Structures are given as C-alpha cells and as structure tokens.
C-alpha cells in the first residue's frame, strides 16, 4: 500500500545492506523507495526481475524457501548452530522505535470518537482475537493503508498482504479461499463500504458453502478522499457518497450481521461473530466509522 512504519523508515535511512526476498524491487507508488548507494541482494524466481528497476550487487535465482534454507545452512557453517546472537542490540532498537511509533499514533488508536476511528476499530479487533490464531486480510484503498502498519503478523500465513494492486472487493475472495485452506482458523477480511459494493454478494457464497468468515465493513458513507479525484461530480452529484444497511444485506444472504456504533461495543461484537463463524455461518460486522484520511507515510 501507500503506508509504512517508523521502524522501517529509520532502518532504511541507516542501513548499509538490503536483502530482498521474493521481491522485484520494482519502483512504484506502492513500494518503499530504496536508499541510494546501499548494497543490495535479491532473491527471486523471475530472472527478468534482476536489476530491472534497482541495481543489485548480488542475485540468486530460485524459490525463496530453498534459497533461505541454503543461506541458513551457510550461516551455520560459518557461525555455528546458534549463530552469534543479537550482538548489536537490534531487537532492543526496534522495540524502542516501535514504542515511539505507537506513542505517536496512540491518540488515534485510543480515540473515543463517534463515528469511530478506523484505528480504534483495529485496536479493539486485535484485543478481541489472538492474531496468532487468525488469518487476516485487508482490501484496497484506505482500509489497507490504515491496517497495514498496525496489524501484527506473528506467525507465517496469519496475514495476507497485497500491496501492489487496487481492485476493490478482492479481500473477500481471499478470505473465502483462506477459510477453505485453513478451516480451523479465524479468518477476517476488512473492507470499506465501497469495496462491499463491488463484491458483497459473495457473502451468499460463504453462507451456501458454510464458510465461517468474518467480514468487517468500515462504513463511513463515502469513498474516502475521492472528492479530489472527481471534484465536479462530487459537488454536483455527490458521486463519492455511499449509502445502505450492510448488516441487513448480510442477514438476507444468510450471514450473521451486527451494526457497531461505539468502540466499547467492538469486543463483544467480535466475540459473537467468532461464535457464529465456528458454526460455519459467515459473519459481517458493520462498523460505523469516520472518514479518516490520515495515514502513516513513513518510508514513502
């Protein structure tokens, strides 16, 4: 997406080496710019991606898993089975920068505003479930920009990120696939009301197939920031405005549905959605939120 964390930004500014795993190093609005003059190594299974947009000093063509295994084997042969440990205190440095980052965003993450702040919604979601037991994905647009810097990916395959494409509604399909692949997991997709308008009917697919996904819709009544893209249409025809009761829509399609208007309701609503999902019934939580344009643009 278009966002980044303070942690990534600080290390990009001070690093002397970057290892890209499974990346094209493409220059895009959706990727962090690489600092100039820094030695780079690239692992990719697409030969054409080597030196495509960014010059790399070391390249490895191969599957990321296999190359990483080879790197680990070579590291152990040089440094021993347990390596040399965190001799430079990098973990503590990351923790300190993260503390600074979270303090900066604390007012939004702890906001009691009504309509609700998306950041407070995400915080309450994280408190309501164990991210280790979940598979979470976002949608494109502002929901992605807002959740990416803050949702913790604590285990492999617990978070599905897709940052270089912008099709609205794609996250719902990803959630259905994830639930089929890992039915024991709590699968959550976060989408805006515009994204629901593009793909929301697939809630019926989840109901019919007994796929207990949880869809969190951030309903702020608009396509955020689109007045800048279509000022005339926005002024004369309100082309950026959206309306509807997505809770009732979900119920009519066989899902459990609940509308949430206050931050203190989120935890209990999430618990009820999880219980419904365990029976194979998809759940939709319609979060009445504010239009939030502030995003974390560190490293951009």
Where are these regions (language model features)?
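Glycine-rich, acidic loop regions that bind phosphate or pyrophosphate groups
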Residues: 1-93, 230, 273
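Thiamine diphosphate
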Residues: 9-15, 51-53, 59-61, 65-69, ...
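Structural signal for hydrophobic packing residues in well-ordered secondary-structure cores
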Residues: 16, 22, 68-79, 98-105, ...
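Structural beta-sheet core signal
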Residues: 20, 42, 136-138, 189, ...
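Alpha-helix capping/helix-boundary segments
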Residues: 25-26, 142-143, 222
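A short, charged, Gly/Pro-tolerant segment at domain boundaries
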Residues: 90-102, 284-295
């Amino acid at each position: 997406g278009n966002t980044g964390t303070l942690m990534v930004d600080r290390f990009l500014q001070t690093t002397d080496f970057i290892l890209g795993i499974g990346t094209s190093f493409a220059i895009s609005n959706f990727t962090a710019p690489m600092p100039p003059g820094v030695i780079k190594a690239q692992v990719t299974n697409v030969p054409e991606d080597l030196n495509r947009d960014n010059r790399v000093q070391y390249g490895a063509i191969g599957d990321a898993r296999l190359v990483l295994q080879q790197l680990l084997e070579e590291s152990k042969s040089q440094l021993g089975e347990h390596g040399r440990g965190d001799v430079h205190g990098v973990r503590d440095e990351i923790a300190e920068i993260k503390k600074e980052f979270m303090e900066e965003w604390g007012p939004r993450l702890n906001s009691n505003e009504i309509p609700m702040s998306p950041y407070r919604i995400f915080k309450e979601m994280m408190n309501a479930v164990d991210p280790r037991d979940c598979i979470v994905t976002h949608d494109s647009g502002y929901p992605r920009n807002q959740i990416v810097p803050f949702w913790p990916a604590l285990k492999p395959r617990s978070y599905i990120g897709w940052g270089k494409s912008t099709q609205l509604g794609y996250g719902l399909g990803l959630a259905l696939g994830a639930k089929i692949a890992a039915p024991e997991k709590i699968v959550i997709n976060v989408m805006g009301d515009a994204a629901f308008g593009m793909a929301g009917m697939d809630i019926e697919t989840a109901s019919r197939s007994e796929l207990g996904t949880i869809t969190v819709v951030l309903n702020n009544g608009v396509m955020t920031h689109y007045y800048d893209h279509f000022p005339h249409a926005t002024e004369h025809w309100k082309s950026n405005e959206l309306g509807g009761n997505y809770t009732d829509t979900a119920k009519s399609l066989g899902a459990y549905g609940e509308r949430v208007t206050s931050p203190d309701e989120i935890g209990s609503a999430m618990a009820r959605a999880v219980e419904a999902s365990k029976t194979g019934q998809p759940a939709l939580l319609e979060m009445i939120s504010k239009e939030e344009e502030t995003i974390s643009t560190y490293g951009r």
